[in-house]
Amino acid sequence: MDQTAMRLQEYDPTCEWDVAFHPYANPLTTTDFWNNSGVWQGSGTSYINMYNLNVLTDYIQANYPLRDEKGNDTGAERFVILSEQGYSSNNGYRLQASALAYSYYIASYNPMVKAFEIRSYQDDANDGILCLGIAGKDAYNAYKYVDDPSDTAKTYMKNKHYWTDVRGGAAGWQDLRIPGYDGSEIAVNRYIYKDEMVYHNDVYEAKVP
């Protein structure tokens, strides 16, 4: 990213570029991305996934502010599109659902994130043993209800396993590490595009539940 940014700076200092990022768990076979090794806060981290996504957005904000023709900081932010991610259900449907909900909350409370796209709506044989799809699994309802303001959705998302799977003893989202979390309703205060990608006839097509 730094090399590309430097070239753009040389070519056109006012060029408005943004970032598309795939914050998969490492390795891909793991579901509990918050326990991945080599993932920590700070620019010295070995890997960036959803757990420390703010390392990426903070770095971009600090090092690559949008500037006008005179080189002055405009105060505007670049944005990040999380254009592909997904979590394996091989470690349990419930854990996959918790990982998806947790990562969506992390994305939703990060003001630089403007899109959150799921890799697979259905399991794809081309992915081998990963089983990243959500159709017919707990993760489908988690994704469907995570930012739905209806009473049904709110009740569904209050299932405590969404928190305790991430941190034992947690009593709510406020007990997890979600930068910027303030308890506000995502659907009311955040506007974030979401869809799944369905593999069909050798192309990926958008599908919204």
Placement of each model-derived feature along the sequence:
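Aromatic-rich peripheral "rim/lid" segments of glycoside hydrolase catalytic domains that contact
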Residues: N91-V208
